[in-house]
């Protein structure tokens, strides 16, 4: 059994933080989303595919800042491009800088549905404006949704502080289940503005699902049939599964789509992209503005990140790493005798525990992630992982063995 990590400074900083910030740290970074007392709460720095906490413990990081790190931490080419922009031109002005056009032309070149784009800062910004565009264009109100789309009022799972009327026109359907979507569309056929879906199913704390053959095509057809817009939320899949997103990978083109996270390797930028007919409502009918949306630091980072992704065929390398890693982990899981599932795409691996009526799976899950972090492998119990370009073959091989040893400890509890 691996030894417990020394986390004294992390814990001390957290106690101080709770007097300064509600909850100490924001949202999904709070200890209850990991294993309290076993995981660090504050990182100090990162490089490549590794991060170091404030107590000096180094980890192979498979959460990748919840997805933005597609290449690696502190990539010199990207950072240098941003620093050059800040030092020599500036990045925050009353008007827009010309690199906006450069980035949007590149997005239009790569993403099947992209004829126009609106640049924003976060995934939540992008999905929320997508809903506004769908409603503004169609003149309808209701939305069918699947997946996590951010923290804004219309879609957040935790409803505290949100009047029901702000989300009462949002209807949730099940992934890979056409009947659940059809029922919503038929019941609201005269007022359905749009369908928003993550093209890869990645619910929090549950198995990652790939679309069944014909599923996304059928969703596309239903959107046409019920005269509503199809929106792909590609915040996680974009610039990770392919340069054109899951829509390019699976050959199904939505009307609108959102991108972010890996788009700029960690810098704050996201985009709503789509067909000109629909996007044009943002020119006059639908309002979109923010002090920081035009800031060029994220735009420059995105331009440079995409340049590197294309030039070095980064996503092909990431997929190959993920396939090899996944095959080895799957074998370990099968041999472990522990009731777990290994799911996901090559770029999004995830081990989940099979639920049982007695709730033993919760204890098994806690023990597994306790052992894993003690092996200095950073994964999140309730969120799938990510592979990045800077994860080395040695990192991945070590992690396979760490998973093997962690599952062996879990097996002792059965």
UniProtKB/Swiss-Prot annotation:
The modification N6-(pyridoxal phosphate)lysine is found at residue 261. Keywords: Aminotransferase, Pyridoxal phosphate, Transferase. It is an enzyme of class 2 (transferase). It catalyses: (3S)-3-aminobutanoyl-CoA + 2-oxoglutarate = acetoacetyl-CoA + L-glutamate. One of its GO terms (biological process) is L-lysine catabolic process to acetate. Optimum pH is 8.0. SUPFAM superfamilies: PLP-dependent transferases. The keyword Glycosyltransferase does not apply. Pfam families: Aminotran_3 (PF00202). Gene3D superfamilies: Aspartate Aminotransferase, domain 1, Type I PLP-dependent aspartate aminotransferase-like (Major domain). The keyword Transferase applies. InterPro entries: Aminotrans_3 (IPR005814), Aminotrans_3_PPA_site (IPR049704), PyrdxlP-dep_Trfase (IPR015424), PyrdxlP-dep_Trfase_major (IPR015421), PyrdxlP-dep_Trfase_small (IPR015422). Its EC number is 2.6.1.111. Pathway: Amino-acid degradation; L-lysine degradation via acetate pathway. Its cofactor is pyridoxal 5'-phosphate. One of its GO terms (molecular function) is pyridoxal phosphate binding. 3-aminobutyryl-CoA aminotransferase that acts specifically on coenzyme A (CoA) esters and catalyzes the conversion of 3-aminobutyryl-CoA into acetoacetyl-CoA in an alternative pathway of lysine fermentation. Homodimer. Belongs to the class-III pyridoxal-phosphate-dependent aminotransferase family. PANTHER family: GLUTAMATE-1-SEMIALDEHYDE 2,1-AMINOMUTASE (PTHR43713), GLUTAMATE-1-SEMIALDEHYDE 2,1-AMINOMUTASE 1, CHLOROPLASTIC-RELATED (PTHR43713:SF3). This is 3-aminobutyryl-CoA aminotransferase. It comes from Cloacimonas acidaminovorans (strain Evry).
């Amino acid at each position: 059994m691996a030894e417990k990590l020394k986390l004294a400074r992390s814990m001390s900083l957290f106690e101080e933080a709770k007097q300064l910030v509600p909850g100490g740290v924001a949202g999904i970074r709070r200890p209850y989303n990991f294993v309290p007392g076993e995981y660090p709460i504050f990182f100090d720095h990162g490089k490549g595919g590794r991060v170091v906490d404030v107590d000096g413990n180094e980890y192979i990081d498979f959460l990748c800042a919840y997805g933005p790190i597609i290449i690696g931490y502190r990539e010199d080419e990207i950072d240098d491009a941003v620093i050059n922009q800040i030092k020599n031109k500036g990045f925050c002005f009353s008007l827009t800088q010309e690199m906006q056009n450069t980035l949007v032309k590149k997005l239009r070149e790569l993403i099947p549905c992209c004829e126009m784009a609106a640049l924003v800062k976060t995934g939540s910004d992008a999905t929320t404006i997508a809903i506004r565009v769908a409603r503004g264009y169609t003149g309808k109100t209701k939305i069918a949704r699947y997946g996590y789309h951010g923290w804004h009022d219309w879609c957040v799972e935790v409803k505290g502080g949100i009047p029901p009327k702000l989300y009462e026109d949002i209807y949730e359907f099940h992934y890979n289940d056409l009947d659940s979507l059809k029922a919503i569309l038929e019941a609201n056929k005269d007022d359905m503005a749009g369908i928003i879906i993550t093209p890869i199913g990645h619910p929090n704390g549950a198995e990652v699902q790939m679309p069944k053959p014909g599923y996304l095509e059928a969703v596309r057809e239903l959107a046409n049939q019920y005269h509503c817009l199809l929106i792909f939320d590609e915040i996680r899949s974009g610039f990770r599964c392919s340069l054109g997103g899951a829509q390019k990978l699976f050959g199904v083109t939505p009307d609108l789509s959102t991108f972010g996270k890996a788009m700029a390797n960690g810098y704050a930028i996201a985009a709503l992209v789509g067909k000109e007919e629909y996007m044009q409502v943002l020119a006059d009918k639908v309002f979109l503005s923010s002090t920081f949306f035009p800031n060029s630091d994220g735009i420059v980072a995105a331009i440079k990140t995409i340049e590197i992704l294309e030039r070095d065929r980064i996503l092909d390398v990431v997929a190959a790493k993920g396939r090899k890693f996944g095959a080895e982990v799957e074998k370990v899981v099968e041999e472990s005798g522990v009731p777990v599932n290994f799911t996901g795409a090559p770029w999004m691996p995830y081990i989940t525990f099979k639920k049982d009526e007695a709730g033993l799976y919760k204890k098994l899950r806690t023990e597994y992630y306790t052992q894993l972090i003690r092996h200095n492998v950073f994964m999140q119990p309730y969120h799938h992982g990510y592979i990045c370009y800077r994860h080395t073959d040695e990192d991945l091989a070590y992690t396979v063995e760490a998973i093997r040893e962690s599952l062996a400890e879990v097996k002792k509890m059965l």
